[in-house]
């Protein structure tokens, strides 16, 4: 049927913000398992990228039904965009659509632009691009903003009991206030 033909043609194309690209590296290596990523380097790389939401150290990549399986099932591809590419794409979107977008959307748009330029997208392809964060700059124009610091920062490998105790203490504190 026509509906099943459309479904068969769907291809998942995802991106990461360089230099924080652990899923991209695993995908390029053909690995379901995330590759080793030294903690200090991972932290440093995550600090460099604009799209902080793309800096998950333990994403649902290799789990059954996770991103690896979804990419495999759709013949998908993984792309990388630098901060400069993403900023350029965000600027282009604002010029063409009149609204600002989040950094992660800029990474996705930059990857799409690069994929089109490289001939990886057919000219008659139907493309769905997930764009988030439209209008934040406009929203902030006449608002007073407060930048809050976290109440607690856990180590990379926290003790489960410590996490539970700290979270319970946060809720107890908020309830008492």
Model-derived features: where do they sit?
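Short glycine/serine/threonine-rich phosphate/pyrophosphate-binding segments
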Residues: 1, 23, 104-112
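Active-site catalytic pocket residues across diverse enzymes, especially alpha/beta-hydrolases
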Residues: 4, 27, 115-119
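Active-site/ligand-binding loops adjacent to catalytic centers
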Residues: 5-9, 13-100, 144-177
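Extended hydrophobic-aromatic, low-complexity segments
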Residues: 79-80, 99-103, 123-124, 139-140
